[in-house]
Amino acid sequence: MQNRNTFSWVKEQMTRFISVSIMIYVITRTSIANAYPIFAQQGYENPREATGRIVCANCHLANKPVDIEVPQAVLPDTVFEAVVRIPYDKQLKQVLANGKKGSLNVGAVLILPEGFELAPPDRISPEMKEKMGNLAFQSYRPTKKNIIVIGPVPGQKYSEIVFPILSPDPATKKDVHFLKYPIYVGGNRGRGQIYPDGSKSNNTVYNATAAGVVSRILRKEKGGYEITIADASDGHQVVDIIPPGPELLVSEGESIKLDQPLTSNPNVGGFGQGDAEIVLQDPLRVQGLLFFLASVILAQIFLVLKKKQFEKVQLYEMNF
């Protein structure tokens, strides 16, 4: 009887341990997967400022190009592609958080007009799904379905990102009209230089916080440096901490100025933004245009036939 109770207790503890382990794994993976979009989502209600600047530029300081391609016009309740291209040299390597070199990742934010949103999976064609790859898009906010974010994803595979977009129908959404609308996009390649709290990452240049003489350079066991500067004004010691990644540019005994670079700038990535325009086209207007073109063509045909008939009558009268 005691053995049976012991077995039940062991079984219960193992079950509890496995359940807790699974929960920790899921939470950890979720936080890692969502780390990039959360940087902007937690800090800003809207990723596009009143000036037109996209807030990702606050952390990704280098300016790089980005391109967007959308149809000139779409019909209501239609799925279409918005293609975002984030070009960069695939041979480049970036500094990772641990100071080692690795491949660049990319990310993008697509700001659509109100009413436009990510297409549901059952509306996406197999051809479009093949172009999309294994990307997981998400809305910037549950209440802002027109703003879509993606990343970080491997740049080697996804420097061109296909967004599946569903256009709104003014018949069901009264605040949507048949007009020309702007679309804004921001895209980055590589890690940022500043974290949302204002602290520097190891993917940027580090400058001297005091003028003076470099009295000591200590290489840390896990990488990086502690640089001790004897202040030129009063001789007190200032210690600058350099994380693993950037290459050191100064040496012991060297005189340096305030804000002089102590390291190289390891950043090889950057952020860019662009825009495009799209027309939400009224089907009745399209039908009217087609009817007008058809009537013009028919009128031309009848005019040609009438002219030939008139020429035949003239020829007959001349012969008579």
From Swiss-Prot:
Binds 1 heme group covalently. Residues 1-35 form the signal peptide. One of its GO terms (cellular component) is chloroplast thylakoid membrane. One of its GO terms (biological process) is photosynthesis. It is a single-pass membrane protein. Its main location: plastid. This is Cytochrome f. Heme binds at Y36, C56, C59, H60. The chain crosses the membrane at residues 286-306. The keyword rRNA-binding does not apply.
